[in-house]
Amino acid sequence: MTALDSSRLLQPRTASVHRRTGETDVQIHLNLDGSGRHEIDTGIPFLDHMLAQLSTHGLIDLQIKAIGDLHIDDHHTNEDVGITLGQALAQALQDRRGIHRFGHFWAPLDEALVQVVLDFSGRPHLSYGLELPTERIGRYETQLVREFYQAVVNHAQLTLHIRQAAGLNAHHIVEASFKAFARALRMAVERDPRRQEGIPSSKGVL
C-alpha cells in the first residue's frame, strides 16, 4: 500500500448535500467515521427521533436541517430528507473502495423484532416487510416509513431488505427497524483492513 493509500484510509469520510426544491430546503452533513453526535431538525418530531437512532447506533455524525411545506403534510419533507440522506451516503462512500459492502442486524425493542440486511451494490432495491398496526404514530403517517426508506435506497444505490419477525406497537416496530438499519449500515461501511483500497466486487466496480 502506498503512502497515499494509507493517508486516504485515515481520512474521515464526510459529505455535505444541500437540496432545494419548490417544496423543501434540506441540508445534510454527515461523517461516516463519527461517534454518533447529531443535530437534527426536520420539523417532523418522529422522523427526528428515528434519525437520532440512525446516528447513535450507526456511529454517524449527522447534522440535518429541513424546512418544508408541512402546512400541507409531512410527505414532501419526509421523502426529501430521505433523498438527501441517500445522496450524502453515496457522496461519502465515493466509489465504495475498501468497505465491507454488506451489513445485517437483528434489533429488538420490547415485543418488536426487526431484521435489516443491506448491500451497497449500486443497484437500488427495497424489500419492505413491516406490518404496522396503526395509520399514525403521533401525527406521523406510518405509510411514510416506506417512502423514507425508498428514497434513501434510490439515492444511495443500495439493496435493502427489512423483515419484521414480531411486533405489536407501531412505534416499537419502526424504531427497531431504524436501529437495525443503523447497525447494518455501520457494518457495511466499515473499512475492511484485508481489502484495503480494493473494490468489493468481482466486477471491479460498484
From Swiss-Prot:
CDD domains reported for this sequence: IGPD
GO molecular function terms attached to this record: imidazoleglycerol-phosphate dehydratase activity
Gene Ontology CC: cytoplasm
Stretches the record annotates as Disordered: 1-21
Top-level taxon in the UniProt lineage: Bacteria
The protein's annotated pathway: Amino-acid biosynthesis; L-histidine biosynthesis; L-histidine from 5-phospho-alpha-D-ribose 1-diphosphate: step 6/9
Catalysed reactions, as listed in the record: D-erythro-1-(imidazol-4-yl)glycerol 3-phosphate = 3-(imidazol-4-yl)-2-oxopropyl phosphate + H2O
The EC number(s) this enzyme carries: 4.2.1.19
Keywords: Amino-acid biosynthesis, Cytoplasm, Histidine biosynthesis, Lyase
GO terms under biological process: L-histidine biosynthetic process
Subcellular compartments: Cytoplasm
HAMAP family on file: HisB
Family the UniProt entry places it in: Belongs to the imidazoleglycerol-phosphate dehydratase family.
UniProt cross-references to NCBIfam families, sorted A to Z: PRK00951.1-1 (NF002106), PRK00951.1-3 (NF002108), PRK00951.1-5 (NF002109), PRK00951.2-1 (NF002111), PRK00951.2-4 (NF002114)
The protein's name in its UniProt record: Imidazoleglycerol-phosphate dehydratase
Species whose genome carries this gene: Synechococcus sp. (strain JA-2-3B'a(2-13))
